[in-house]
Amino acid sequence: MELQTLTPHICYLPHDPQRDRPMLACIQGQRHTLAIDAGYSAAHVQDFYTALTRQGHPLPDLTVLTHWHYDHTFGLHAAQGLSIAHQRTNEFLRQQQRLAQSGPYMEQLKAEDPHFRLEYAGQDTLHIQLAELTFTNMLTLDLGQLTARIFHTVSPHSEDSTCIYIPEEKILFLGDATSEDFFNNGYMDRAKLARLIDTIRATDCALCVLSHCEPLPKADLLAYLESL
């Protein structure tokens, strides 16, 4: 999987449909480099770092989580630097830690999810780590000539959904916020979707980056969401 360039300061490792690995992005400021999400596993993080190094990019010293789901967070223990998440994300991850410590949780996930089974083939231990820094509503980071506005949003996908907006580049990272609730039989809450649409519309972005598909122009994403 090759690293893709969005702007001179933003690149990403694309979504891998074989394992359903989400995309991982890198925002390079003059002082700090921010990663979007911590990946499915340590192997996912290593593939990301290898791709960054191969193209001469610095490795991230900050990592922000878009939500708690395991394909976005179970690689956090292998990530460099300071990790950031919404407070509810850490609460959910703490629940995951308890599940992993109290029984055969990895075997359960392998039985339920073929992508997880492939990602963790030959492994029998989970390393679930909490983020070191949490926020409640919004957190603004000065990366050096680039700003990362990290904010919680209402979303049909997960109650801890977090977006990252880079105003200088007019790019909005949405994680899986536009998707249905995977852990509630794929339920799509129309009221929450409507509020998310309003949030996207109100954000001065040109491009929207979702975790499991290619980046989309804002107008195209809004048209799709409004058709659901």
PLM ranges: what are they?
Residues 7, 14-16, 87, 154, ...:
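Residues at the C-termini of beta-strands that transition into short coil/loop
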Residues 33-34, 40-42, 94-222:
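Metallo-beta-lactamase
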Residues 43-89, 201-207:
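Active-site metal-binding motif and surrounding structural segment of the metallo-beta-lactamase
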Residues 3-50, 162-176:
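Conserved beta-strand hairpin/beta-sheet module of binuclear metal-dependent hydrolase folds
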Residues 47, 75-78, 97, 186, ...:
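Short amphipathic alpha-helical segments
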